[in-house]
């Protein structure tokens, strides 16, 4: 399986901005999640972010919160998510990034959690509520099992911390495009361009922009501003949840293709 860093390196060689879709594990079911991962992989995703449903998702907007609630109500738990991943990941071209809050990691233990995640075939990890001051232990232990822990920079992040986050972040840097939670918005805030420029002054690591990227034109905008990846979550989660499972899978396939087209450089 290809690492997150290797994937970004190959994309940079082709001057290609990555597409990173996000879906919630277990919504509408783990069986459909497995199919959705394969659909996204086949329809142009460069990397895929998979959210572990959690009861108190502070960074998530209403669409992803509702998906997590539905998944938990159906009994979706971490062990079942990892079991599903272990069957699907070996057949994916795209590296798989697990999005989880810190509480499940803490309760399981950092080392056992990371070992199980690595054994399942996960290549990257995003923990939105992990403070920088507590990240070093997770970073070290994640690297030991071949997992890259990506850290987040937000519009509210003090400039004094941006360089420290950029230095520690592995795989890429996750740039949050707006204050507040995830969700679909009508446009990408202009502040994102400024933040991209600030980050590019202190690091040459890839930068992915997420939160509020919900339309092909949003993805193209962040690409034109110099982002290395467009991360799209709520718009995929919403489409997958609408209609029958088969209709949801068809909808995310179409949407994935439209985003990929928007991110394809014009000769």
Curated annotation (Swiss-Prot):
Keywords: Amino-acid biosynthesis, Aromatic amino acid biosynthesis, Lyase, Tryptophan biosynthesis. GO terms for molecular function: tryptophan synthase activity. It comes from the Bacteria. The keyword Amino-acid biosynthesis applies. Gene3D superfamilies: Aldolase class I. The active site is at residues 49, 60. SUPFAM superfamilies: Ribulose-phoshate binding barrel. GO terms for cellular component: cytosol. It catalyses: (1S,2R)-1-C-(indol-3-yl)glycerol 3-phosphate + L-serine = D-glyceraldehyde 3-phosphate + L-tryptophan + H2O. It holds the Pfam family Trp_syntA. Pathway: Amino-acid biosynthesis; L-tryptophan biosynthesis; L-tryptophan from chorismate: step 5/5. Its EC number is 4.2.1.20. InterPro entries: Aldolase_TIM, RibuloseP-bd_barrel, Trp_synthase_alpha_AS, Trp_synthase_suA. The alpha subunit is responsible for the aldol cleavage of indoleglycerol phosphate to indole and glyceraldehyde 3-phosphate. Belongs to the TrpA family. HAMAP family: Trp_synth_alpha. Tetramer of two alpha and two beta chains. This is Tryptophan synthase alpha chain. It comes from Cyanothece sp. (strain PCC 7425 / ATCC 29141). The gene is trpA.
């Amino acid at each position: 399986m290809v690492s997150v860093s290797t994937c970004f390196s190959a994309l940079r060689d082709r001057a290609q901005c990555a597409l990173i879709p996000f879906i919630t594990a277990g919504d509408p079911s783990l069986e459909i999640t497995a199919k959705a991962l394969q659909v996204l992989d086949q329809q142009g995703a460069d990397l895929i972010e998979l959210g572990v449903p959690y009861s108190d998702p502070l960074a998530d907007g209403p669409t992803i919160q509702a998906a997590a609630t539905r998944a938990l109500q159906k009994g979706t738990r971490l062990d079942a998510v990892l079991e599903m991943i272990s069957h699907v990941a070996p057949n994916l071209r795209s590296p798989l990034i697990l999005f989880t809050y810190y509480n499940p990691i803490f309760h399981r233990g950092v080392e056992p959690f990371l070992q199980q995640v690595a054994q399942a075939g996960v290549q990257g990890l995003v923990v939105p509520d992990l403070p920088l001051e507590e990240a070093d232990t997770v970073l070290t232990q994640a690297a030991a099992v071949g997992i890259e822990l990506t850290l987040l920079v937000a519009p509210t992040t003090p400039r004094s911390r941006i360089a420290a986050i950029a230095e520690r972040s592995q795989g890429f840097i996750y740039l949050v495009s707006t204050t507040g939670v995830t969700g679909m918005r009508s446009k990408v805030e202009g502040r994102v361009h400024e933040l991209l420029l600030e980050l590019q002054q202190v690091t040459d690591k890839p930068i992915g922009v997420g939160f509020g990227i919900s339309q092909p034109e949003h993805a193209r905008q962040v690409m034109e501003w110099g982002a290395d990846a467009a991360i799209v979550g709520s718009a995929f989660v919403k489409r997958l949840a609408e209609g029958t499972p088969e209709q949801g899978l068809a909808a995310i396939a179409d949407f994935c293709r439209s985003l990929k087209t928007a991110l394809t450089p014009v000769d």
